[in-house]
Amino acid sequence: MDAEFWLERWRDGRTHFHQQRVTPLLAKYWPTLQLPPGCRVLVPLCGKTLDMVWLAQQGHQVLGVELSSLAVEQFFAENGLQATVREAGPGTYYSAGDISIYCGDIFDLGADVLGDCVGAFDRAALVALPAAMRPRYARHVYGQLSAAYRGLLITLDYDQSQMDGPPFSVRDDEVQAIYAGHSEAVLIDRRDILSKEPKFAERGLTQLDTLVYRLQRQG
């Protein structure tokens, strides 16, 4: 799986992973992080999620990262935002108000950008990556965030033999292994969501849990 996989999904309109609402678990647990007002929050592999609008409404400076320029342009258009555009190395920044999206590869961003992020929200990034790429992603992104960072991570847990990802199953033991060495991942919620996600039952799943973690720099 490479960048072209996701670019093709956006071109073909196969974006069932996009939610037409703010993630309820974000709204429930984000206030518990007690992040300072005005701080920068990273939303990796953001697509055109409405979570970025919600985070900006909470007083944050939002930095999304997305490969597809089509997704980025749709986000600003659908939310009535006029973005300014500037080139930045191999990628492009789109900005409007308190929301900026870096259109490019997240691995091209270094500590000069990621180090300014005090918050992070990952609903769609870790579960979108194949297993071999997840440790590298976590080290690169979370290892370079502000030393004071706090964030939320949402994953899925299901029998991978019943369905091919993405989204992939990322169990608790894997989360702990991936983030060990730079971050603490504390499981704060786990719930069965299969009855609310019939499309996954149609793909053969008999069990589907969502897991919510509070992340912070390892003390």
Swiss-Prot record:
Pfam families in the record: TPMT (PF05724)
Origin superkingdom: Bacteria
Protein's name in the database: Thiopurine S-methyltransferase
HAMAP family with a match to the protein in the record: Thiopur_methtran
Keywords: Cytoplasm, Methyltransferase, S-adenosyl-L-methionine, Transferase
Main location: cytoplasm
Catalyzed chemical reaction(s): S-adenosyl-L-methionine + a thiopurine = S-adenosyl-L-homocysteine + a thiopurine S-methylether
Keyword Methyltransferase: yes
Residues given in the record as S-adenosyl-L-methionine binding sites: 10, 45, 66, 123
NCBIfam families for this protein: PRK13255.1, TMPT_Se_Te
Localization in the cell: Cytoplasm
InterPro entries referenced in this protein's UniProt entry, alphabetically: SAM-dependent_MTases_sf, Thiopur_S-MeTfrase_Se/Te_detox, Thiopurine_S-MeTrfase, TPMT
Residues making up the signal peptide according to the UniProt record: none
Record-stated family: Belongs to the class I-like SAM-binding methyltransferase superfamily. TPMT family.
S-S bonds: none
EC id: 2.1.1.67
